[in-house]
C-alpha cells in the first residue's frame, strides 16, 4: 500500500509556518509532512528531518534542497541534534507523527505485520537492538505478559505468554504468521474486523523500539529546542501514545503544583508554565478515514511554547 500521510494539512497548519522559520520533522517517514512544510518555506527557511529507519533516510537523501537536512537516528536525541547545530531555543515548530509508515507495515521482511509472512523483527532500525524474535526466545513469561498487557492492552496476555514460553522449547517463534496463527488459536476472536493478534503485535513493536520512552524523552526535549511562540504538533495513533502527549501538555500548562501551604506566588507558578494548548484535539474527517483506513485512530494535538 502506498503511504498516505495522515492529517497532513491539519498538522502543518498547526505549526503556523513562517517562511523564514526553522522547523523539525521528527518523523520523516516517506516525507509527506516535510514536503508540505518545504512548500511553505521561503529561501531563508530551514527544515531538519529525523528518522532512524535506513530506508526513510535513503529517501530523504535523494532530496536536492539546500533548505533541508536529514538526520539519521532516533528522535529522542532531538536535544543533541539541535545543540550540535546551535539551535537550542530557536526552533519555530516541531512535528511528530508517531505512526508506523505503510511501507514498514507492508514490507514482510520488516516483520511489523502478520498480513504478510516475514521474519519476526519489528525494529525501526534493523541494524541495532534486539528483534522481537530474539527477545521472545529468552524473556521471562511474566515479562512477556506484562508487555502484552501494558503496551497492547491485551486481556489474554497471560495465556499468550504461557503459549510462547511452552512452544519455544522445541519451536521458537521466528516468523510473523507463525506467531499470529498461535495467538488466533488461543485468543477468542470477539472483536469484529480486528485480528486477534493485533494487540500483541502492537505491544511487541512498542517494546522492541522503546516507543513510549522515546516519546517521553522527545517531548521533554521539545521544551529546550522550541523558541518562544514555537509550535509542537503531535499525531498519535493509539491511546497509550495520546495519553502521554495529553498529560505532558496538560502538565506543562499547569506548571508546578506545590503542596498547599508552601509560600509560592502565582507569578512563580506562572514562570514554570511552559506550554499552552492550541485548540482542541483534531481527528481525521470521515472522508480521510474512507480514503485511508489506517488514519481512523489518529489524533493531533498542538501546543505553543510560552516565554519570551
Curated annotation (Swiss-Prot):
Q: What class of enzyme is it?
A: transferase
Q: Does the keyword Cell cycle apply?
A: no
An example Gene Ontology biological process: rRNA base methylation
Keyword entries, A-Z: Cytoplasm, Methyltransferase, rRNA processing, S-adenosyl-L-methionine, Transferase
- Signal peptide feature range: none
Q: Which reaction does it catalyse?
A: cytidine(1402) in 16S rRNA + S-adenosyl-L-methionine = N(4)-methylcytidine(1402) in 16S rRNA + S-adenosyl-L-homocysteine + H(+)
Under InterPro entries, the record lists:
RsmH, SAM-dep_MeTrfase_MraW_recog, SAM-dependent_MTases_sf
Q: Which family does it belong to?
A: Belongs to the methyltransferase superfamily. RsmH family.
- Function per UniProt: Specifically methylates the N4 position of cytidine in position 1402 (C1402) of 16S rRNA.
HAMAP family, A to Z? 16SrRNA_methyltr_H
> What is the designated name of this protein?
Ribosomal RNA small subunit methyltransferase H
Lineage of the organism: Bacteria, Pseudomonadati, Pseudomonadota, Gammaproteobacteria, Aeromonadales
Which gene name belongs to this protein? rsmH
